[in-house]
Amino acid sequence: MEFSLLYIHTAILGLISLFLILHFVFWRLKSAKGGSAKNSLPPEAGGAWPIIGHLHLLSGSKLLHITLGSLADKCGPAFIIRLGVRQALVVSDWELAKELFTANDVAISSRPKLLAFESMSYDFAMFGFSPYGAYWRELRKLISVELLSTRRLELLKHIRVSETEISVKELYNLWKDKKNGSGHVLVEMKQWFGDLNLNVILRMVAGKRYFGTIDAKDQEEARRCQKAMSGFFHFTGLFLVADGFPFLRWMDLGGYEKKIKASAKEMDLIAEEWLQEHRRKRESGDVASEQDFMDLMLSLLEDVDLPGYDPDTITKATCINLILGGADTNTVMLTWTLSLLMNHPHILRKAQEELDIQVGKERRVNESDIANLEYLHAIVKETLRLYPASRLGGPREFSEDCTLGGYHVTKGTSLILNLWKLQRDPRIWSNPSEFRPERFLTTHKDLDVKGRYFELIPFGAGRRSCPGTAFGLQMLPFVLANLLHAFDISTDEKTDMTESPGLTTSKATPLDVLISPRLSPNLY
């Protein structure tokens, strides 16, 4: 998660400074008392200011994972930062990560109750933001067994296959219509990846297809959906004044709570329209032979009683969560993968050579081909190592006192796992900042990304690991293989790798590439 420090006006600070100081002193005395009879506390990073702690370090132009990585070089693999009256433990070491996800997995399976999380997730009804407990366990089981199981993904395989075929054909038609004198067309690939992934996940979850249609209603709904999704990722990627100082929430400094609630309401309106449409079809008997996730949720919740929320809220929250996670993460990862290939054309050529050997140029890539593309899988793994979609993993909170690496960690401490730093450990990876897929065919060929090897955990690990890992590991190589097999892709200049802040770390600038077909016209 990226934190953005929102300014506090000097006048307001003057009015509340005395109260803040008293609260700060009380918190420090309480923290000192809590650790006095325990193991030693983790070191605190230097540079903290009175009252606000380290918030000033997190508000500059440097991205948070890089700032925290620099602090780890000074403070060690585990250290504390203070965010107002909150404190967070920053971990940057795979051995400590292993201890976290084995000995302390239950204790770190909850989420901090941040303002944006509360407002955007139906008061924590979304499984991605729910605190650890009976509700989360039952919902996670339902999602894993009924929605994202291997069997369910196999049943819906034709969706990702057909949408990929359609998107490749649209790219080819664009080339036919707009190619330049040298036989290339310039394409912005972030948008292409985004439209493809959103179509796939929307069809799976809500039976919708927004992009590539001429229906004006669908296009308007698509714009609303994209705007609402953009708002979700913007606001959940912020650390607000009210998060660092909960007792100031009533002031709504900067009007952010009002904006967050407006964005959440728009997302809910869209989900409510989907829900009512599905309910009308069920009541009229017009149920499709292929049920999407919303159909399944409506059926499943007739027989399951989840505590704390009504069935409609659970259905909407779960479907939105699946759409947001599935579309955004895959788009971010495909964008970074292609960006890396543009800056390493020799690796791109090797990937295409493998495709020509395993698939040939007389047909298109089938899903059955993917298992044979070892070098392509190595490219995906290396991208996930260097550019995990969420550089700091999902934010967590200790629900009980713990011991980690000999340090005492108090209940209520937030956990920040710096995957960006952890997965570039020079003790594990030679030349850790270099893009070298070959390492996954030689020295690290036995490592996977499913949370079993703590040197490489881009999807997290333990109880709170990403439930969509299997889906992501199907989409990423399949889309990439089809794209590289169908087109020659290049750039006139080096691709900009600037990252943007947020809950997921996307490419800050467009990904403009030149494409031309490499197969016979009848194959598109």
From Swiss-Prot:
Heme binds at C466. Pathway: Alkaloid biosynthesis. It is found in: Membrane. Its cofactor is heme. It is an enzyme of class 1 (oxidoreductase). One of its GO terms (biological process) is alkaloid biosynthetic process. InterPro entries: Cyt_P450, Cyt_P450_CS, Cyt_P450_E_grp-I, Cyt_P450_sf, Plant_Cytochrome_P450_Monoox. Its main location: membrane. The keyword Membrane applies. One of its GO terms (cellular component) is membrane. It is a single-pass membrane protein. The keyword Oxidoreductase applies. One of its GO terms (molecular function) is oxidoreductase activity, acting on paired donors, with incorporation or reduction of molecular oxygen. This is Strychnine-10-hydroxylase. The gene is 10H.
